[in-house]
């Protein structure tokens, strides 16, 4: 479809089919549309609200242009949509280390900060992890440690085509929805934190159509008007579980899993160096209990969707064991040490 045809269809309030959206996104990624046209398309899609077919079409386009990486298909991604503006520390990154210490393979897809002070890539760098490790070295890191961080700009170079337009628009677009569902390793097991509960059903349908094996979509309450793209230790958490082709809805409280109920302010983070120190303190057991509980909750769900735990309670036991035995701390140190060694090896090979 030509740019004008897509614009006219969206102006009239019509949805695009999966194929139309994939074709449209291909044109955007390949700079075949004008900047003004691309901006208008993104704004109109946002005003209308993206359908599952449109999201799947956009995903198909971006994934087809992504840099491939081969990891264990049982690996789990822990990520969130961002956008909650609560200023919490990097809960899902801390949880990834705890779960990995419990023997769960992790393939975390992430980026630098967009809506927060500190994205997953930022905090990993502050911990000493080189996020731009080439895919072949990342595969080796995963084989040695069971952990890989997939830095979005490295694996999705086509996204650069819209970076300036997105920044100039200054509004949420369909691209804000795509991060959690375009993991370049093609993971089938995920914990996805969703800031906007109105899009949870869209994510659920997209994940099922994309062949998800076991995933949990979570939206946490903070006890006030703010929401979290994390499971919450501040109030109830709404969950949509996707397992064996079924959609199951839950609402849970932190007390259901032996966790405390905390004020959102007790989960506050800061810049990348502050958040890196928080993660170290969680893993060595010296952090305030509120922060430990938040990381344990996300790790417990990660263990559950991995298949290693039969329920979240069992995932909690595995996660607590990972902390208490220092397996999580040892695993993080091993991951960073191995990452640095492989990065140095790659640098030496190019000199």
UniProtKB/Swiss-Prot annotation:
EC number(s) stated in the UniProt entry for this protein: 2.4.2.18
Q: What is the lineage of its organism?
A: Bacteria, Pseudomonadati, Chlorobiota, Chlorobiia, Chlorobiales
Originating species: Chlorobaculum tepidum (strain ATCC 49652 / DSM 12025 / NBRC 103806 / TLS)
Q: What does UniProt give as GO cellular component?
A: cytosol
How is the subunit organization of this protein annotated in UniProt? Homodimer.
Query: SUPFAM superfamilies of this UniProt entry?
Result: Nucleoside phosphorylase/phosphoribosyltransferase catalytic domain, Nucleoside phosphorylase/phosphoribosyltransferase N-terminal domain
Q: How is the cofactor bound?
A: Binds 2 magnesium ions per monomer.
Name-wise, this protein is Anthranilate phosphoribosyltransferase
Alphabetized UniProt keyword annotations: Amino-acid biosynthesis, Aromatic amino acid biosynthesis, Glycosyltransferase, Magnesium, Metal-binding, Transferase, Tryptophan biosynthesis
Reactions the enzyme catalyzes? N-(5-phospho-beta-D-ribosyl)anthranilate + diphosphate = 5-phospho-alpha-D-ribose 1-diphosphate + anthranilate
Q: What is this protein's function?
A: Catalyzes the transfer of the phosphoribosyl group of 5-phosphorylribose-1-pyrophosphate (PRPP) to anthranilate to yield N-(5'-phosphoribosyl)-anthranilate (PRA).
Pathway(s) of this molecule: Amino-acid biosynthesis; L-tryptophan biosynthesis; L-tryptophan from chorismate: step 2/5
Residue sites binding anthranilate 2 per the record: 166
One GO process term, biological-process aspect: L-tryptophan biosynthetic process
């Amino acid at each position: 479809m030509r740019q004008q045809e897509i614009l006219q269809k969206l102006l009239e309030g019509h949805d695009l089919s999966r194929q139309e959206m994939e074709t449209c996104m291909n044109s955007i990624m390949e700079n075949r549309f004008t900047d003004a046209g691309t901006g208008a398309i993104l704004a109109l899609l946002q005003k209308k609200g993206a359908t599952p077919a449109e999201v799947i079409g956009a995903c198909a386009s971006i994934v087809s242009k992504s840099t491939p990486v081969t990891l264990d298909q049982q690996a789990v991604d822990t990520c969130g949509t961002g956008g909650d503006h609560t200023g919490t520390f990097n809960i899902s990154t801390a949880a990834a280390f705890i779960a990995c210490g419990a023997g769960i393979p992790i393939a975390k897809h992430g980026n630098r900060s967009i809506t927060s002070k500190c994205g997953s890539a930022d905090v990993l760098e502050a911990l000493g992890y080189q996020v731009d490790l080439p895919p072949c070295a990342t595969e080796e890191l995963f084989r040695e440690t069971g952990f890989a961080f997939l830095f979005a700009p490295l694996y999705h170079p086509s996204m650069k085509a819209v970076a300036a337009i997105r920044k100039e628009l200054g509004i949420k677009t369909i691209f804000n929805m795509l991060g959690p569902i375009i993991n370049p390793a093609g993971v089938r097991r995920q914990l996805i934190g969703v800031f906007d509960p109105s899009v949870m059903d869209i994510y659920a349908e997209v994940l099922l159509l994309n062949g998800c094996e076991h995933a949990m979509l979570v939206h946490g309450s903070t006890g006030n008007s703010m929401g979290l793209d994390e499971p919450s230790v501040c109030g109830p958490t709404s969950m949509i579980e996707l397992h064996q082709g079924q959609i199951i809805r839950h609402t849970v409280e932190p007390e259901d899993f032996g966790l405390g109920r905390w004020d959102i302010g007790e989960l506050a983070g800061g810049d990348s160096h502050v958040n890196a120190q928080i993660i170290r303190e969680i893993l060595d057991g010296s952090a305030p209990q509120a922060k430990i509980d938040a990381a344990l909750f996300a790790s417990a769900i990660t263990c559950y969707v991995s298949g290693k735990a039969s329920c979240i309670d069992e995932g909690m036991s595995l996660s607590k064991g990972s902390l208490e035995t220092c397996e999580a701390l040892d695993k993080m140190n091993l991951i960073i040490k191995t990452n640095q060694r492989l990065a140095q090896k790659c640098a030496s090979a190019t000199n």
